[in-house]
Amino acid sequence: MNRMETERMYAYFLCSIPMIGGVRAGQLEERFGSPQGIYEAGVTGWRECVSESIAEYMDRQKKEDAWRQEYAQLAEKQIHLVFPWEEGFPKKLLTIPDPPYGFFYKGRLPKDTIPSVAVIGARECSDYGRYVAEELGRYLGTHRIQVISGMARGIDGISQQAALSAGGTSYGVLGCGVDICYPSQNRRLYEELGREGGLLSTYAPGIRAMPAYFPPRN
């Protein structure tokens, strides 16, 4: 394994900690020099930069060592991982206050050269809301405008399904790993997004949806 791939592997370790965003990861890198330096700092070093609970979580991840196998299985699961310093990282994400340290996806990433629209709404929507979401999704899909949403019940999923049915493309930004279908009732949409668009997440494979993970996802 060359040095670049080694650093990538250790960067994945940091991605496996769901409580660490881009800003905090950057602070850790500044303190310890590199992803491998962060890993080797251990719990004593981590306590200088993160809370006790996060340091303990990182220590458990390091001791269990399952993250190495998870990293090795990404290609087998057809899961891609891209970092801000690599070609292919979504440039628009670099403009937000806390850009992700790493970004996972299945399928494709949205194209910067094609217009995109985020459609977001209530999970428990009215009949009128459902109608508008379907019409909007169909219109965007027909006009080849990318629909980006959260694959949630209600407005999100309805608009995405309509866009796909109209021959368009859509991308689901998840509050869990891209290998997990959440909510489970959107299984058909999840599979279609993986084929016709993309499933995107800042959370590593295997990380299940938690209420605290959705605000950063949004």
Tell what function each PLM region has.
Residues 2-5, 83-218:
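Glycine-biased, small-residue-rich flexible motifs in mid-sequence functional cores and linkers
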Residues 1-142:
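Short, positively charged patches
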